[in-house]
Amino acid sequence: MQTQLAPEYQNTADGQAAEAILRKCVHCGFCTATCPTYQLLGDELDGPRGRIYLMKQVLEGQTPTRATQMHLDRCLTCRNCESTCPSGVDYGHLVDIGRKLVDAKVPRPLGEQAVRWALKEGLPSPLFAPAMKLGQMVRPLLPQSLKNKVPVPQDAGAWPTRQHARKVLMLEGCVQPAMAPNINSATARVLDAAGVQVQVARKAGCCGAVKFHLNDQDGGKAEMRANIDAWWPYVEQGADALVMNASGCGVTVKEYGHILRDDPQYAAKAAHISALTRDLSELLPDLLPVLKTRLDGQAVGAQPALVFHPPCTLQHGQKLKGGVEAHLAALGFVVRIAANEAHLCCGSAGTYSVLNPALSYQLRDRKLGYLAPAANEVIISANIGCITHLQSGTATPVRHWVEVLDAALSATQSGFAA
């Protein structure tokens, strides 16, 4: 796609990056077939090709409007279109640029500004955990719209204390410790059972995704630099990997190298951090032999059958498909994915469920319909946002897959102890 950049964008990093991405687009429209919002709304401007045209017009000097902003806001940034595109259009990076340019020219109403500010400042804040705890205390009194965002409190269980020669770093995340603390401790226990010690850099915080995708890119980059500083001593001490058990964080940290590529102080470190980053499921191939010796077949068989929802940030953002299901099956678990639309977004998409609740809940209900869990099944996923969003629409338990593996290991140990 040929683009004639307006003079104001010709010599800018954003303009040049966007032009290079647009050059790959051949208008084929394959992306519309796998775009969740196009499937719901049937509007060309609510699909990737239409949004690309809107961004192209802005880059060529056309003044954007609130309608332009709305169509870009409706994008989930699920990146399903990237998996479908035969030309390799880097849509995710393009829409980040497009939103930044449009927001610079289209003021948002004060109400929208307030909500977006509260999200980008509140979710990564140390005050989020006590606020969530308070919400959980009064959860029965909350209206359904708020109750959907406040999960039932859970016990995290004990953190392992054994020392191992093999060590990995893990990002705890900003919302996960407050909303689902068992995910991090279950990760530590499972890796401990496989002979791997989990280390946590206490000064590391939000991965930067919330601010970056809410168009506070400078704020997001500041959080990324702070994380690199927190992790670097562990990297120098030889940490094997930087493990992510939330695929939304993982896809962001894997892009630190790209996002900070022009930062003379952090570019090399950011690239190294990205290369070191692994989704938790990427460790499983090496750990399967040890885990098989730690698991009792009866303990695994006593676990419920599993229905796996692969997050978009895992299957499209990180291009990791099929691994979770295959590895769990190799350990003896009964696991399946939805027969239809397993590739489509559940509607969570970070802060999307707050900013676009109507579309988000339509996608959630559609996803739950295709997952169709039976009475004896549990839904599993690999991202805190997907887990809490899906749980808000079903009585079927929704868990992280590592929690199920941890439960089977615990049952095995209890059986041996008995």
Regions found by a protein language model. Give the residues of each.
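Short His/Asp/Glu-rich catalytic/ion-coordination signatures at enzyme active sites or charged loops
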Residues: 60, 84, 215
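Generic N-terminal leader/targeting and pre-domain segments
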Residues: 1-28
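Cysteine-centered iron-sulfur cluster-binding motifs in ferredoxin-type domains/subunits
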Residues: 19-38, 68-89, 313, 343
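N-terminal glycine-rich anion-binding loops that anchor highly charged ligand groups
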Residues: 29-33, 43-47, 198-200
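Generic structural signal for well-ordered secondary structure
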Residues: 28, 45-51, 65-68, 74, ...
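Non-heme iron-sulfur electron-transfer modules
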Residues: 1-11, 37-70, 88-116, 399-404
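Iron-sulfur cluster-binding electron-transfer modules in prokaryotic oxidoreductases
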Residues: 14-15, 91-418
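Short secondary-structure boundary/capping elements
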Residues: 17, 63-67, 363
